[in-house]
């Protein structure tokens, strides 16, 4: 049997696709070259923005037509499967399985059915989307591993769901309430990843700061405590050198977490701290639970406590009722903080969220124009910061040969900056940490030459 994945959306979706792929590989399945030749097509979907849903609907139309010409199975999973299951089943009856975010335990039986070549039919599981308030976490299952074969990086989901209910966000309605993974399960996955040669891990959650797992005695483990446990575990085999985490809600960024980042050298000095907006009135309507001043205070603490810390963020432009003055306050905040990078987007109405019914929607032309100004400002700041790296010696994790020149190697810095090692570089450095000296910036990539391999 052969399979192929199409994955849309966040890093959590990427991790969950990798986890499902592990189940398939364990059953002896192999990856197909493309979606047109596979026995089973798995589409992992996102509902955060309407553009992602529109693209998936287009793909479903294409693949439904393809099923008229050849027999294969289509599995739809992820947030669209949870949110729009009835619409999808009605509009695309040739889809074989629709697996929502609370139905991960179904995959083993689905794959067994496919292997037995059962007659294709509509498959419906017990959806929880309308009842998650009574059963907030009952159906969610963490996978054992999100490892991708041959990769030196790996995601580790540590929690799922969100209790914040920002007025614009669909995530709590498709992911449910927060649930945290037990400490031992996370540590066991770290051990497995170390054995497989992984050098860098990224902890995932809709709000990792609110992690509240349990140890084997049943005691609550906070997120800073989890990080310290992970660092100590990684020190044992000394294979995993860099630990990242996303995403962090500003209201839950504690002094203990800031101190932990400052004290532990394996924690990357890059913190993703979504601000969303720079005007207090908009932040209040967004239900973000902090003010502009509180956010800037957190940034000040981070910069004072963690030398050379880099900050990334999310910026949401064109929220209902946003005035020109509100927008200018966002630009001012960006200039003051000087984010190293940002995910920038304009407001997308999501049916079922409180903001969907808010008055004073911003015209499309205004939203787009404001977003372009935000992007231009951030690109200028990012370029300035990257140019400041020229001449400096930085650690880099070498990932692969360069796609443009196989004699050169490709990797990334601790801050996630793409880096090309120029000249003929020994390919045995792939999967290792090296020191490089930055020569120049091309586009959004650092060009550098090898100095030496870093001490183990």
Curated annotation (Swiss-Prot):
Tagged with keyword Signal: no
Cellular component aspect of the GO annotation: cytosol
Subcellular location: Cytoplasm
Cofactor note: Binds 2 [4Fe-4S] clusters. One cluster is coordinated with 3 cysteines and an exchangeable S-adenosyl-L-methionine.
Coiled-coil blocks: none
Keyword DNA-binding: no
Domain TRAM, chain residue ranges per copy: 387-452
Chain positions recorded as [4Fe-4S] cluster 2 binding sites: 162, 166, 169
Alphabetical UniProt keywords: 4Fe-4S, Cytoplasm, Iron, Iron-sulfur, Metal-binding, S-adenosyl-L-methionine, Transferase, tRNA processing
InterPro entries: Elp3/MiaA/NifB-like_rSAM, Methylthiotransferase, Methylthiotransferase_CS, Methylthiotransferase_N, Methylthiotransferase_N_sf, MiaB_methiolase, rSAM, rSAM_horseshoe
First-level EC class: transferase
Gene3D superfamilies, per database record: Methylthiotransferase, N-terminal domain (3.40.50.12160), tm_1862 like domain (3.80.30.20)
Domain MTTase N-terminal, chain residue ranges per copy: 1-116
EC number(s) given by UniProt: 2.8.4.3
Binding site for [4Fe-4S] cluster 1: 10, 46, 79
Catalyses which reaction(s): N(6)-dimethylallyladenosine(37) in tRNA + (sulfur carrier)-SH + AH2 + 2 S-adenosyl-L-methionine = 2-methylsulfanyl-N(6)-dimethylallyladenosine(37) in tRNA + (sulfur carrier)-H + 5'-deoxyadenosine + L-methionine + A + S-adenosyl-L-homocysteine + 2 H(+)
Pfam families xref list: Radical_SAM (PF04055), TRAM (PF01938), UPF0004 (PF00919)
Cofactor(s) the protein requires to work: [4Fe-4S] cluster
Family classification: Belongs to the methylthiotransferase family. MiaB subfamily.
PANTHER family per the UniProt record, alphabetical: CDK5 REGULATORY SUBUNIT-ASSOCIATED PROTEIN 1 (PTHR43020), MITOCHONDRIAL TRNA METHYLTHIOTRANSFERASE CDK5RAP1 (PTHR43020:SF2)
Functional description taken from the UniProt entry: Catalyzes the methylthiolation of N6-(dimethylallyl)adenosine (i(6)A), leading to the formation of 2-methylthio-N6-(dimethylallyl)adenosine (ms(2)i(6)A) at position 37 in tRNAs that read codons beginning with uridine.
Subunit structure: Monomer.
Protein name as catalogued: tRNA-2-methylthio-N(6)-dimethylallyladenosine synthase
Lineage: Bacteria, Pseudomonadati, Spirochaetota, Spirochaetia, Spirochaetales
Name of the gene: miaB
């Amino acid at each position: 049997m052969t399979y192929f994945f199409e994955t849309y959306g966040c890093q959590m979706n990427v991790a969950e696709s990798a986890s499902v792929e592990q189940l398939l590989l364990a059953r002896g399945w192999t990856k197909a070259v493309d979606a047109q030749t596979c026995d089973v097509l798995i589409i992992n979907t996102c509902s955060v923005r309407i553009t992602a849903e529109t693209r998936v609907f287009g793909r479903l139309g294409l693949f439904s037509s393809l099923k008229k010409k050849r027999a294969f199975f289509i599995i739809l999973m992820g947030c669209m499967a949870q949110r729009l299951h009835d619409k999808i089943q009605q509009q695309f009856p040739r889809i074989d399985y629709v697996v929502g975010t609370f139905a991960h335990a179904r995959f083993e039986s689905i794959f067994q059915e496919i292997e037995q070549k059962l007659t294709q039919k509509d498959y419906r599981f017990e959806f929880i989307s309308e009842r998650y308030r009574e059963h907030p976490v009952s159906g969610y299952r963490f996978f054992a591993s999100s490892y991708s074969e041959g990769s030196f990086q790996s995601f580790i989901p540590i929690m799922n769901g969100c209790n914040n209910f920002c007025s614009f966000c669909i995530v709590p309605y498709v992911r449910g309430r927060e649930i945290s993974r037990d400490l031992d399960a996370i540590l066991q996955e770290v051990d497995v990843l170390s054995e497989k040669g992984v050098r860098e891990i990224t902890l995932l959650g809709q709000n990792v700061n609110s992690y509240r797992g349990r140890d084997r005695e049943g005691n609550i483990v906070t997120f800073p405590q989890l990080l310290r446990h992970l660092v100590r575990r990684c020190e044992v085999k000394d294979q995993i050198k860099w630990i990242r985490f996303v995403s962090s809600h500003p209201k839950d960024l504690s002094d203990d977490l800031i101190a932990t980042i400052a004290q532990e050298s394996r924690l990357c000095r890059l913190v993703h701290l979504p601000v969303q907006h720079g005007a207090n009135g908009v932040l209040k309507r967004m239900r973000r639970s902090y003010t502009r001043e509180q956010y800037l205070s957190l940034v000040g603490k981070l910069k004072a406590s963690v030398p050379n810390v880099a900050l990334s963020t999310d910026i949401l432009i064109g929220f209902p009722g946003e005035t020109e003055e509100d927008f200018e306050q966002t630009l001012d905040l960006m200039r003051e903080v000087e984010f190293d990078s940002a995910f920038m987007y304009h407001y997308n109405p999501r049916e079922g969220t409180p903001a969907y019914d808010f008055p004073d929607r911003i015209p499309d032309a205004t939203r787009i124009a404001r977003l372009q100004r935000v992007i231009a400002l951030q690109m200028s700041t990012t370029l300035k910061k990257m140019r400041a790296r020229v001449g400096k010696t930085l650690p880099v994790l070498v990932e692969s040969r360069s796609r443009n020149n196989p004699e050169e190697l490709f990797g990334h810095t601790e801050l996630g900056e793409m880096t090309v090692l120029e000249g003929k570089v020994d390919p045995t450095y792939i999967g290792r940490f090296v020191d490089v000296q930055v020569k120049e910036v091309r586009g959004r990539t650092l060009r550098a030459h090898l100095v030496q391999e870093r001490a183990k």
